[in-house]
Amino acid sequence: MGDYFALVASDLHLKKRTWSNRPIEGDSYFAWEQIVDRAIAVEVEVVILAGDILDKQINGSGPIVKLQEGIEKLGAAGIKTLFIQGQHEYQEMPWASLSKHAIHLHRNVVAALAPSIEAAGYTIAGIDFQAKERLQDELSYVAETLKYPPDKTILVMHQVWEEWMGERALPQGKLSDVDNWLPGLGLLITGDLHESHVETEPIGPPLDASLPAKWRRNKILSPGSTCMQSISEPEDKYMYFLSSVDGSLEIKKNTLLGRPFIDWPFIGTVADIEDCIREYYTVYEDSQSHAEQHSIPAEICKPLVRFQYDHSLSGDAHRLEKLVGDSAYTFWKEHAPKDNNEEDSVVVSGNNVTMESLLTSVECEEDVRQVAERLISSGDPYEELKRWNNEQADESH
């Protein structure tokens, strides 16, 4: 075995077309292939996947076959794949029973297979995604059944944590809940947040004011997603390696290669557009050279480009759009500079306010806007949403 005993990743969302309604394909598969190859090269004992490996809307066999191929390749190298479920996977997960090299870490497996999920002196436990009302029971169960002390335990979870995502999504638990039941864990690995985040200082103020002032906070690793699945996500993606050095758990991040991403500086004047037209292909060619240098597959080489421009330049921006053409997947966002005292709110004046007029007043990504427009214009939004889901499933085959 090598210096590292585990490779950690999360939120693969394996499917051929990673984005909802853009023909952007291959990204999640390419990330998974890198994870498998890197784990074998480094000679880890286990690969840990912290949920949302697959996606509920994907009913075809392609993603499952791709996942199984990777698990079998790891198994042939003597590497076990340890996983939990996120909220994006079906609960039955029949694929898991197809490989002797994949181990479901959820609580029943913790109790039954503990000897086979120890690595480098640590026991690795896991809890599938839980609704908020179930989380306390699951944490209590793990706390009661662990065979190792907390500081020699790695716990894998997948939750919408209030401390991290409370303003963006409906929280399904608090990180302080884990601190309360399992203080001083060797490491808490958590999925769902598509941003990489590491907290390595275990001593500090309590996350919950009701906890004692000297409470020992857990070390936390959020691997983030393995490829961009939204233009609002961070472009940098990672897998992480774990090692045990003198009894201490060390974390090292390793960059995942991915589709080139060009985030153009804000375009506020016609002169900015002229500069952009002159400079675009230089930047584009640099991105292609980088992709070629790192042997990025051809289907991953077409870059993502995000342009934000002043709303008064809509007509001029069309010239830039024509220049870019099919050389990149482009994302355009009109941006009206706000007064410093202006609040983040939408004001629609007039007596004839409609859903359509409200939608045009809200800033959102183009794919989200298109789906919203379909639902608004449909006589039966529920049936329209089902049709849209079926379209996404068909596109992934």
Predicted regions and their residues:
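His/Asp/Glu-rich metal-coordinating catalytic cores
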Residues: 20, 57-221, 225-230, 234
